[in-house]
A protein has these predicted regions:
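Short acidic-aromatic low-complexity motifs
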Residues: 2-27
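Alpha-helix N-cap/loop-to-helix boundary motif
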Residues: 1, 13, 38-42
Length: 128
């Protein structure tokens, strides 16, 4: 992973464009949700979950407050306020040799934040 891949992630996040998101994901991408026990395997499921998250955080004060990156991985700490609940979390992203996201793990705190995200994500996923 290099600066262009991380910059591409930030651009897709800002745009919320589903086609651009899919283009960033490896065919065998895996998404690890803070509220779903099993990892979600494959580009389509990963895109679906990330797309729902984009919609949950749209219109909030979501922002990354810290970034730690290496050649193939990044840890991106974020904060957002959803319905008055301050949420703090970390996106752990791994890029494969082709520069596509192959693993995306989300960790969130506090418990009230996880519960609120779960509630909002369920609504978004049902509408997709």
């Amino acid at each position: 992973m290099s600066a262009p891949e991380l910059a591409a992630w930030h651009e897709v996040l800002a745009s919320g464009d589903p086609a651009s998101l899919r283009a960033l994901l490896a065919e065998d991408a895996c998404f690890h949700s803070p509220v779903v026990h099993r990892p979600q395997q494959g580009r389509e499921l990963t895109a679906m979950y990330l797309g729902a998250a984009f919609r949950v955080f749209a219109g909030t004060d979501f922002r990354y407050v810290r970034e730690i990156a290496s050649d193939t991985d990044a840890a991106l700490e974020f904060t957002a306020t959803i319905d008055g609940i301050v949420v703090n979390g970390v996106d752990l992203i791994h890029w494969n040799a082709e520069g596509r996201i192959s693993d995306f793990k989300v960790m969130v705190r506090p418990l009230k934040g996880i519960e609120k995200i779960r509630e909002k994500m369920a609504v978004m996923l049902e509408s997709m």
